């Protein structure tokens, strides 16, 4: 009788196979996990706008103003590394449209400047300095172009995509492709000096750009924008995420019709979406100084080490990453104040977390 009972109890165990474990909800990709481990990185703003002492270039600056006599990529990268930064993103083109590499897409580029007699490539120098120092390297290329006469037409979109192709193919593996949500407004536009408005829900055709270019040419690059696809903007430029921060996010705004950079559910960007459909953690961006570009009148107004550490705890400590804006002077160097603060911040991070 006991044998029969044992057999009867054994039959279900033999017949019923355990179900394989199923993932719960949205999950991170390998590229996103690599980004998460970066924790703190920097965003370098350095264009003719620096020499104009502005925050937003209009697109009409003479390339001749761009001449950083003592530019030293190693100094900038070294200071960033001493601050505990593990990567740098270079603004290769800001809204003013000036390209820091010798592009074939527009004459408004570094080859028309007197720097290195027009033979320089600032993107190359920063990229090589990052590789040498062991830092990751990424690219920011503004979709809005206040210099280009064709901005707002289909022809400009082809120009922008060709700029991305050049950047993706010339400067090695990128850890981020950074896309700003600012687009459309007044500008030089080849001399028109007018205001132009575009429908950002359709004009850039981001799905095509990111799928056909970024994913194919730079598969390891995390796409950053208001909506991701990989990393989302936190919704402020103060350097912190909400106390409750979900890596999952539903980016479509309440007003619809779809989410694109510049048209996103910013009300929940800082917190994210509990049980959200997409894994899109937040980047918390903030400049070391009051502005993203260098302004001599802001010397002495840099964030303190204690302020930076508090931002670290409110960004990285909440499951996001911290993107710290660095602004070289017109000499092409980080100011000594910035270098000192970065070094002290890096030491504070080391001393605080040296014991696990």
State the predicted function of each range:
Residues 8-17:
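Hydrophobic h-region of N-terminal signal peptides that target proteins for export
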Residues 16-356:
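Mature catalytic domains of secreted/periplasmic carbohydrate-active enzymes
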Residues 1-9:
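Sec-dependent signal peptide recognition
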